[in-house]
Regions:
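N-terminal carbohydrate-binding accessory modules
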Residues: 6-59, 89, 93
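Short, well-ordered coil/turn segments that N-cap beta-strands
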Residues: 29-31, 56-58, 92-98, 153-160, ...
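The substrate-binding groove and active-site-proximal loops of carbohydrate-active enzymes
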Residues: 30-42, 66-83, 120-139, 163-174, ...
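Aromatic-lined substrate-binding rim segments of carbohydrate-active enzymes
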Residues: 45-111, 182-186
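Aromatic- and acidic-residue-enriched segments that line the glycan-binding/catalytic groove
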Residues: 74-80, 104-128, 178-182, 210-217, ...
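Hydrophobic or amphipathic alpha-helical targeting/insertion segments
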Residues: 82-147
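Carbohydrate-binding surfaces of carbohydrate-active enzymes
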Residues: 122, 134-149, 155-163, 174-178, ...
């Protein structure tokens, strides 16, 4: 059975999840990288997406930040850097598939995890089956999802699948809430496969998934693929699921916080770790291109009562640097793919050169 590698332009296809990922009944391995459109200027989207394709990958993944698209209650914005439709079209024109993670909570080291601040003025419990919260999500989805459903794969677009919530198993275990989010999506025309993503540990998988409702389960980790996939496989076996394995967030770097050392990861070690994932399943590199937390949208972690704000840069020590150019990590992973997965065609990446003045970039 010949594998499908890339999106065939202008041709509708069917994506299914069985014992493996299948496109039109042919086996498909997802090689995805995260590029958040809201962290990259629109004039640079093509550059970043092209470099993802040039690496040998076939899919782009992105979150959608509710607090940017509905900054005030009932006031919506899908223009400029928030034009998700234009972003997806750019990806499709390059032959890339897309994985969409459409809120309500995204984490992503983003202000309030993507939740709009005006929710705090409402009498509701966020990320729960509270009717007031679900109504707010429903109103947002009424505006958002009609922009996405025409771009589903079986409607001629490039969206393979969409996520329900985000790492909910690290927060709560309100299954009624997860089912309600799924229902809101399906009632508004989302017909593609749905999935959840959580840490691959028993407690988080039990709390954050809808495995008994046949919602596909993915895991998030940055190393030890053998161990983490084994944990997921055990969970699948317990629930009678014969699904493919996928790491939805393979952390190839890490975010940085004020007054803390910049975190770096060895390129060759990363390339080997990516190879170990691909030997068993599919991957989404988080991040492929981190970009920038524009304005005051950088998030904040906490350690006890101590706030640990992230910096403006979301470079993440990713495969592309903050401005979108290839790093040593990019070339190390590309060499690994060329050696072990030559069936995925590669190209020379684009590099943007800056003017120089007395040794400083302008």
């Amino acid at each position: 059975m010949k594998a499908v590698l890339y999106l065939r332009k202008h041709q509708m296809a069917r994506f299914k999840i069985g014992h493996s990922f299948c496109l039109d009944d042919r086996e498909f391995k997802i090689l995805s990288g995260a590029i958040h459109y809201f962290r990259v200027q629109p004039e640079d989207w093509y550059h970043s997406l092209y470099n993802l394709k040039a690496l040998g990958f076939n899919t782009v993944e992105t979150y959608l930040p509710w607090n940017m698209h509905e900054p005030q209650k009932g006031v919506f914005d899908f223009q400029g850097i928030l034009d998700i439709e234009a972003y997806l079209q750019t990806a499709q024109d390059l032959g890339l598939y897309a994985i969409i993670r459409p809120s309500p909570f995204i984490c992503a080291e983003w202000e309030f995890g993507g939740l709009p601040a005006w929710l705090l003025n409402e009498n509701m419990r966020i990320r729960s089956s509270d009717e007031a919260f679900l109504q707010a999500v429903a109103s947002y989805y009424d505006e958002l999802l009609p922009r996405l459903t025409p771009r589903l794969l079986d409607n001629g677009g490039n969206i393979l699948m969409m996520q329900v919530e985000n790492e909910y198993g690290s927060y709560g275990e309100d299954k009624a809430y997860l089912r309600a989010i799924r229902q809101l999506m399906e009632e508004r025309g989302v017909t593609c496969p749905l999935f959840t993503s959580d840490g691959p540990w028993r407690a988080t998988l039990q709390a954050g998934t809808l495995i008994d409702d046949d919602v596909f389960v993915t895991g998030n980790f940055g190393s030890k693929a053998d161990y983490n996939f084994a944990q997921m496989q055990e969970f699948f076996d317990e629930h009678g699921k014969k699904w493919p394995l996928m790491c939805m967030e393979f952390w190839d770097g890490w975010f940085n916080r004020w007054k803390e050392p910049i975190i770096k990861r060895d390129p060759d070690e990363l390339a080997q770790a990516v190879h170990e994932v691909l030997q068993q399943g599919s991957i989404n590199l988080y991040m492929f291109h981190g970009g920038t937390n524009f304005g005051f949208m950088n998030g904040c972690s906490a350690r006890g009562v101590i706030d640990l704000p992230q910096v403006t840069s979301y470079d993440y020590d990713a495969l592309l640097d903050e401005r979108g150019n290839p790093t040593d990590k990019y070339h190390a992973v590309q060499r690994m793919l060329k050696e072990h997965y030559p069936e995925y065609p590669q190209m020379e990446p684009l590099v943007e050169y800056s003017a120089q003045s007395e040794g400083q970039s302008l």
